[in-house]
Amino acid sequence: MATAASNPYSILSSSSLVHADSAVMQQGSPFRNPQKLLQSDYLQGVPCNGHPLGHHWVTSLSDANPWSSSLASSPLDQQDIKPGREDLQLGAIIHHRSPHVNHHSPHTNHPNAWGASPAHNSSLTSSGQPINIYSQPSFTVSGMLDHGELTPPLPAGTTQSLHPVLREPNDHVDLGSHHCQDHSDEETPTSDELEQFAKQFKQRRIKLGFTQADVGLALGTLYGNVFSQTTICRFEALQLSFKNMCKLKPLLNKWLEEADSSTGNPTSIDKIAAQGRKRKKRTSIEVSVKGVLETHFLKCPKPAALEITSLADSLQLEKEVVRVWFCNRRQKEKRMTPPGDPQQHEVYSHSVKTDTSCNEL
């Protein structure tokens, strides 16, 4: 008894448990009363995941630990020394993450198989296989993760040795999505291509004489979806989202092809008119004609309809052109003359009356 008291580690089967990964020995109580164990800590004979759990202190270094065989063959260890909940959870991680899971067939010769006796497990210890001295089931990995425990990292090359169910389900999905993404990138234009197309589209649209509203109406006539002038303007200014720019680009490209093919073809004039209202060209007035109009404006800034008609006939201009010119000239006069000052045509008319009176005298 003196020797046993001086060396409390001599009787291992009934007095202590030794951690195989560290040099510190933790002494336990000689016996633990089975009635004091919680039912959640030790569920004997009820399988949770189909794999009995081995104690991680023994399975980690079964060959290097000289006491592993004595622990496996002792009936007291199997009956009285029970692992705690933390030991069971950590053992479940090591068991599920071990690369030996797929290399051993689930038969009776496996040390973790159901129905394997402790004597058979101890005999496998001498051959170098890890043993499990506890045949009770453990908590699953998912149950462990719910409690916030940490999962040890997998060693390199372990993914292929794992069971297909334990592998990451996103391996094949990532490959498929990557393949689809590469396929979609070939059809999706880049931002530089969109910018270049928007610039070319605006130049060709102006050259053809169509407004942004005309393009929107033409798209509605061709494809049944009318776009507003604001949408076409934002496309040319690159203010739409990248997704909407990609959707609108092929429609505008087809419209350009239709407009280019219709230009110069007399039979397709009605088709162009159906696409939208074509912009009227800006009227250019010669300098001599503009001088005559200025003279008439100083005499009468608001001519009557008969005066506009006779003036248009004398200048060989359209009546609408002459009328619009007088309207624009009056607006220009208002902008140029400060408020309160007499306008130019009033000064001109007053000087004309003065000259007439002087001539009469």
Curated annotation (Swiss-Prot):
This is POU domain, class 3, transcription factor 4-A. Gene3D superfamilies: Homeodomain-like, lambda repressor-like DNA-binding domains. Pfam families: Homeodomain, Pou. One of its GO terms (cellular component) is nucleus. Belongs to the POU transcription factor family. Class-3 subfamily. Residues 278-337 bind DNA. SUPFAM superfamilies: Homeodomain-like (SSF46689), lambda repressor-like DNA-binding domains (SSF47413). From embryonic stage 10, expressed in the Spemann's organizer. During gastrulation, expressed in both the involuting mesoderm and the overlying neuroectoderm. During the neural plate and neural fold stages, expressed in the entire neuroectoderm with expression in discrete regions of the developing nervous system persisting at later stages. Transiently expressed in the pronephros from stages 24-32. In adults, expressed in the kidney and brain. Induction: By nog, zic1 and zic3. It is found in: Nucleus. Residues 119-131 have a biased composition (Polar residues). InterPro entries: HD (IPR001356), Homeobox_CS (IPR017970), Homeodomain-like_sf (IPR009057), Lambda_DNA-bd_dom_sf (IPR010982), POU (IPR013847), POU_dom (IPR000327), POU_domain_TF (IPR050255), TF_POU_3 (IPR016362). Transcriptional activator. Induces neural-specific gene expression to act as a key regulator of neural differentiation. Residues 100-131, 150-189, 333-361 are annotated as: Disordered. One of its GO terms (molecular function) is RNA polymerase II cis-regulatory region sequence-specific DNA binding.
